[in-house]
Amino acid sequence: MDKTYQPHAIETSWYQTWESENYFAPQGAGDSYTIMIPPPNVTGSLHMGHGFNNAIMDALIRFRRMQGRNTLWQPGTDHAGIATQMLVERRLEAQGVSRHELGREKFLDKIWEWKAESGGNISRQIRRLGSSVDWSRERFTMDDGLSDAVKEAFVRLHEDGLIYRGKRLVNWDTKLHTAISDLEVENHDEKGHLWNLRYPLADGAKTAEGLDYLIVATTRPETMLGDAAVAVNPQDERYKALIGKFVELPLVGRRIPIIADDYCDPEFGTGCVKITPAHDFNDYEVGKRHNLPLLNIFDKNANVLPAAQVFNLDGKLNESVDGTLPAAYAGLDRFEARKQIVAAFDAAGLLVSIDDHALKVPKGDRSGTIIEPWLTDQWYVSTKPLAEPAIAAVEDGRIAFVPKQYENMYFSWMRDIQDWCISRQLWWGHRIPAWYDESGKVYVGRDEAEVRAKNNLGPEIALQQDNDVLDTWFSSGLWTFSTLGWPEKTKALETFHSTDVLVTGFDIIFFWVARMIMLTLHLVKNEDGTPQVPFKTVYVHGLVRDGQGQKMSKSKGNVLDPLDIVDGIDLETLVEKRTSGLMQPQLAKKIEKQTRQEFADGIASYGTDALRFTFCSLASTGRDIKFDMGRVEGYRNFCNKIWNAARYVLDKGEDCGQNGEAVELSLADRWIISQLQRTEAEVTRQLDQFRFDLAAQALYEFIWNQYCDWYLELSKPVLWDETASIERQRGTRRTLVRVLEVALRLAHPFMPFITEEIWQRLAPLAGVEGKTIMLQPWPVANEARIDQAAEDDIEWLKGLMLAVRNIRGEMNIGPGKPLQLFLKNVSADDQRRLSENDYLLRKLAKLESMTVLTDGAEAPLSATALVGDMEVLVPMAGLIDKGAELARLDKEIQRLQGEVQRVGGKLSNAAFVDKAPPDVIAKERAKLTEAEQALGKLAEQHARIASL
C-alpha cells in the first residue's frame, strides 16, 4: 500500500471495475429492495443537495445489498421543461435565431441534439460520487416508454373524470408566456407602496361618519380596472349599513357591490378592500364565495386590453357585465398603466395618500419577471378525490414519513389541496394528448388514430392537437412505476414495485411526493385490484446550507459544487465559477471578495469518501443541514487514520491463523471483539432507523477511538513481548486483521472506495473469499462474544493510563520520560488488574516502577489523580523545574486574562452586540467561554505545582 492515502489514485478505477463487473445490477436472493433516484434536471449539474441525497441513497442500497436483498437503485434524469427550453433558446439567440423562426419540430430537434451533447454530465457526476446505480436501467422522462406511460395516465385520468379543461387563475410568466407552478415562483421582500384611493358611494349612500365615499387601500392600483366588488368585514360596525349597497368605480364608471367577507382585516388600512378576482389569488377565492364576475384586463404580456374579458366562475363568457375600459390605457404595460391611473386619481381628487409598504413580490425563478395572476384556459387534475386515499395510505401506515413530524406537513397540504394545473405553454415536454375540431370540441386519446376511431371522425374532419405540454411534475409523478414498464405488466414492475424508500428534501413533499402517492394509488393496482403505494417509506432530509446557515444560492455566492470538494479547485477557477453567469452581475465584486476570504488557498482535494461520510454524519432529523468544510477535513483525516491503521495491520498481519492454526486471545483482543459486536448492532440499528448521523458516529467512535487509538497501541506490547507465546501473538494478529476486515464492511456503505481498496489486500489474511467487498455479507453481532469482564478491565486500564497521561500533560513532563508510580486505596480488583497487566502498563505508560502503598504509608510529594477510588501518585522530585514551570504558567495565565478582558469587553459593548450578525456574536461568546475554562484549568495547575 502507498504510504499516504491518495483518493484520486483509487476512486475512478474502482468505480470502473464495479460497473464493468455488473455489481450494481439486482442479484441478491432475498426480498427486493428498490430506490428510484429523484431525477435531477438534465440541464444542470449536481449541487450539494444532490450530493447529500446520493450519499444517503447509496448508503442504504449498499447496506441492503450486503444484507442479501435483491437491490435495484435506478437512475435517470428529468426533461425539466422550462429550464431546458430556456437554455436551448438562449443558445439559439446567441446565433441570432429564435425558436419561432425555427418552428416547433426543428426547435425540438435542437433540444434533442443538445441533450445528446450534454446529457451525460449528470451521469458522470453520479459516477464520481460512487453511486452504485444500475446504469443498464437509466431512464429519461421523455423516453419513448415513459411518453407512452404519460399518455396512458392522462387518458385514464380523463376517462375517470379526474382531468378537465377550465378557465382559472394561474401564475403567469409574462416573459416566458406560460403558466408556472408555485415552486417556480420566488417571493422577494421589497419596499413598495400602499395607495389609498377614494371610491364614491352610489345612489346617495353615506358612511356612518356621513362621507359619500369609501377609502380602499391597494398595492396594485392598475388592477382597479378589473374590480368586481369592495369587501368589508361583516363584524366591522363602520360599514355594516353599507353591505349590499354599491360604489361607482372611478375612471370606469361601473357599479360594483359592497360585500361582507371575513377575508378583510378591520385593522388593516381603512378596513375596505378592493376585490379583483381575475388578478389576485385571494380575491379569486372571495369571488368564488360571492359569485362575482371575473374581469380579465390584461393580455399575455400583461398589457391592458381595449376591453375587459368578462367570465363567470365556470369559465363561460358573461355578457351581462360591461367590460368597457378607458381607451387611454389600452395597450399600456401594467406598470405604465399604474403611473397613469394613479395620476388620474390624483387629478380627480380621489388619491388620499401614498404610504411606504413592505411587499412580497412574486417573481419567476427562471425569467426573473414579476408573475401575474392571470385567467387562462388550462388543463387541471381534480385532486380532492385523489387526496383522500393518499391521506389514508399515510394514516394507516402503508406509507411512513421519517422523521414522523413531516406527516403533519403532508396532511395539512393534502387537506387543503387545490386542483392541479398540469398544462404549460411550452414546446419541450409531453404534448397533451388532446385534439380539437374546427368548432373547438375537444377529444382525448392516446393518439389521433385512436381519437378518430373512438369518435367516428372521418378524414374530412380536420383535427389539431393541443399545443400545450404537461407540467414536468406530472411525468415525474409517475416515476416509480413508469420506469419499470407500466402500463405493461412487466417482470420488473412485479418484482420492484412498490419501491422501498424515497429520499427527498422537505421542500418538495407537496409538489412531488404527494402527487406520486395520488397518481400511483389511482393508476397501479395489485392482482386483486387493491392500490399500490409508490414507496413504503419517505425519508425526508433538511436543506443543505452553508456554515452560517444561509441557503446556498448563486446570487449569495456561497454555492459549493460537491465535485470541487472531491477533486479540489484552485482559487481563481473558484472565483470565476462563482461570479460568471450571475442574474445580478453587480454582485460579482462582493462574491469575489467573500470567496477570496473564505477560500484563500482554493479547496483541497478531499476525495469522495470524506465528503460522503460528512453528508451521512450531518443527516440528522433537523430541517437545516449546516455544511462545514472543517468536517470534511476532519473526515479526510479519518480516512488517513484508517489507511495508516491498515498499513500497520498488513505489516504485522502475517501468520494470523488464517489456515486454522491455534490462537490465544489477550484481554485487549477479547475487549475489541466485544466492542465490535456492540458497534455492529448499533450501526445496523441506526441504519434501520434512518439515523445515518448516529450510525456514522458509532462507526467513527469505534474505528478511531477504540480500534486505532487504543487497540493498536494495546497490541504492540503483545507483539513485542519476547516471552509471549506464539498462540498469544497469533491471536493478536488475527484479531487485528479480522476486526479491521469487519469494520471495513461496516464502513463500506458510507466510504465505498477506501474500504474496497484496503479490503482487497486484507481479505486473504482474514480468510475471506470474494471478488468485492460490496457483495460481502453485512456483519451481524454475536452476543456470545460480548465480554463484559474484558470491557470492565480495559476501561480500568484506560483510566489508569489516561491518569498518568494527564499528569504528564499538566506537569509538562515529556511522554518518553520514565515515571515512578505509587498507588493508594487499591482494591482486590485493582490489585488483580495491576498484576495481570503489569507488562502492558509499564510499556504503554512508560513506567519505571509501580508501588502499591499500604494503609498509613507516607507518599512522597506527588501529582495525583483518581481512577475510581484508587489514588494514582507520580512523585515530582527531579521531574520538573518548579520555578520555571510556575513562570511559564504565569505567562500563559496573563495572556488568557488579556483575552478574557478583550472578548468580554467586546460582548459588553452594546454597539457591537446590536450590529454584529448572530453567528459572529455566538463565535465570540464561545471564544470567551473557552478562554475562561482554560484560565480556570491553568489556575488549578498553578496551585498544584506551587504546593509541591
UniProtKB/Swiss-Prot annotation:
The keyword Ligase applies. Monomer. CDD domains: Anticodon_Ia_Val, ValRS_core. It is found in: Cytoplasm. Keywords: Aminoacyl-tRNA synthetase, ATP-binding, Coiled coil, Cytoplasm, Ligase, Nucleotide-binding, Protein biosynthesis. PROSITE patterns: AA_TRNA_LIGASE_I. This is Valine--tRNA ligase. Its main location: cytoplasm. A motif ('KMSKS' region) lies at residues 551-555. One of its GO terms (biological process) is valyl-tRNA aminoacylation. Its EC number is 6.1.1.9. GO terms for molecular function: aminoacyl-tRNA deacylase activity; ATP binding; valine-tRNA ligase activity.
